[in-house]
Amino acid sequence: MPIPWVEKYRPKSFSEIVNQEEAKQILASWICTRFKAPQEFCARWAKRRDKEIKEARAVLLWGPPGIGKTTLVHALAKEIGYELVELNASDVRTGERIRQVVGRGLREASLFGYAGKIVLFDEVDGLHVKEDLGGLEAILNLIETAKVPIVLTANNPFDPKLRPLRDISLVVGLKRLSEDEVVEVLKRICASEGAKCEEEALRSLAKSSYGDLRAAINDLQLYLAGRKVLTVDDIKRAGERNPQLSMFEILDRVYKARWFDEARAVSFNPSFDWEQYFVWALETIPIVYKDLEVMSEAFDRLSKADMFIGIVKRTQEWELLSYAMELALGGVSQVKNKPRLPPFIRYGFPQRLLLLAKSKEARRRREMVVEYLARNLHVSKGLVNAEIFYVLSALAKKDDHVVERLARALGISPIDIKNLL
């Protein structure tokens, strides 16, 4: 079985990793400030002196799949002569298992004379707080107590469950590679494999990968399986990859778009959900645009887009949706006196969605009460919600028997019934 090219051509040093200069400098500065590292390495890469870098107990690298988060840590360990203790948080999830694997890795003596050890928790956003018993707590405890560098990676670091990790970690975003940078890497691989690849074909692979170098390399290996020539016609016959974008990437593309059509094009991505986008845009505009006039203009365009959405829902004239998207995407992006935006913007998770998540169980139990009353009183749920529920609430405050009977009928504790009513 052939070696996967993503492993065969994985960068072995910091200098081989392209387009991540800021992330490399921050990570190197953190290592050199808090731990031991070769002087030559620190002199070359440790350029940052930020207070938050010195105080961070761990580093959380984030970004879309395939841009080099894990590779960056591998290259760091090799460059400074550290042994890498690595585990994927999506595979090793329970607290006990995490402590066993990492604890054993830290206790065992190195056979190859490494200068130290570095722990990598890959894909920590794959943890599920309820199902994965103690996993997050175990990672937090290791960060607090371990005397070795700990690095975490995530595709989506702003998941609410990861807030405890964000609070004690230095959050570092990695950028997608540009089309030209991906093409250059693919050219080197073609040359190394002795394959004749048309530049237009490689550019097509790079374009459809949307900066996901791993995906582009995998595609190249697939196309060149059993052959030594790649043409643009080969790509056209097979069709192009359709990338999936997270909401954080969608927001980043909208706010950082250089022109109107670039922001508008985000809506053509298959993962774009305009209803979700409106919720996120409403809460992220003040984070991105600090100037009141710029912020006001962005909100004005978003509100006008929302008016079009309202008309669409009332009249079912869906052709008007395109006008809403023009305002909500291009309009919000291309505001007058738009400031120069930093490479990394810390988008907050919408409070509305957080509140809905927290109240989900209460809303489910209320729905159980409403359905029970509607079924037994032979009325609609709408009538129960509008009138009967409030009458029942008043009765329950005066007579505990009402609460007890409902609790028995629904299998819910009387305390929960009281809270619902």
Curated annotation (Swiss-Prot):
Residues that bind ATP: G63, P64, P65, G66, I67, G68, K69, T70
Nucleotide-binding as a keyword?
yes
Q: Name one GO molecular function term.
A: ATP binding
For this protein, the record's Pfam families field holds: AAA, RCF1-5-like_lid
Per UniProt, which keywords does this protein have? ATP-binding, DNA replication, Nucleotide-binding
GO:BP terms for this protein? DNA replication
InterPro entries in UniProt = AAA+_ATPase, ATPase_AAA_core, P-loop_NTPase, Rep_factor-C_lsu, RFC_lid
Top-level taxon of the source organism: Archaea
Quaternary state and interactors:
Heteromultimer composed of small subunits (RfcS) and large subunits (RfcL).
Briefly, what is this protein's role?
Answer: Part of the RFC clamp loader complex which loads the PCNA sliding clamp onto DNA.
Q: Which family does it belong to?
A: Belongs to the activator 1 small subunits family. RfcL subfamily.
Name recorded for this polypeptide: Replication factor C large subunit
Which organism does this record belong to?
Answer: Pyrobaculum calidifontis (strain DSM 21063 / JCM 11548 / VA1)
